[in-house]
Amino acid sequence: MSRTVRLADGHVPALLVHPHLDAATGRATRPVPVLVWMHGRTVTKELDPGRYLRLARAGIASCALDLPGHGERFDAALQDPARTLEVVERMAGEIDAVLADLDASGEHAGCRRAIGGMSAGGMAAMVRLCRPHAFGCAMVECSIGSWRWQERRAMFDPARVAAMDPFRHLGEWRDIPFLALHNELDEWVPAEGQREFVDALRARSAHSERITMHCYGPTGAPNEHAGFGRFASDAKERGTAFLVQWLLDGR
């Protein structure tokens, strides 16, 4: 069901999970929708197999990417909190080449695709969504779309914030279904910053009911940021239901 490959001319390590993978050939037997997913800082693409398994059982493939400096392209310096926006910038710039390889594979031909991520990975997803794209929906977890809320953190780089902050580029955002899951007591990524962004999306949307934010807490997760603790199963179910609705049902 899964295999590890290199995409984007070999620069981006990816874990591909496909519900119809032929074990003998290593190829998919029929195309299905796909979620392009990016993890958070200091972890790897293999972190959350439960997510990929649930989606595969629902008929959705996953393409999980290692962020720059992480996993198979480990670089301790790039995991420094002060370089978070550099990592986000590089990852957002690599997504198109990843998509080109996914398209060339034929494993998702004629199917919808989604993008999402956790924390820094979610930030990269939102940056990419402020440029022309063909994603049908997006989902992020413990991430932030209004970066002014991180001004006192080491990651805050005024030049990169001006260039990439999704809240400052709402005019370039295409109106698609969007789900944000968050921990209300998140110590690293304030829920208020994501709520401000989601509220702005809803205010601009012709279909505001398709844009939702759900907060948990207290969860017991480390720093109320690394996952959803006692609510992990509920978060997985919400995410899966959202993707099934917009990738498979297409409502």
Task: Give the ranges of each region predicted by the language model.
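Short, surface-exposed "cap/lid" segments of acyl-processing enzymes
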Residues: 20-58, 62
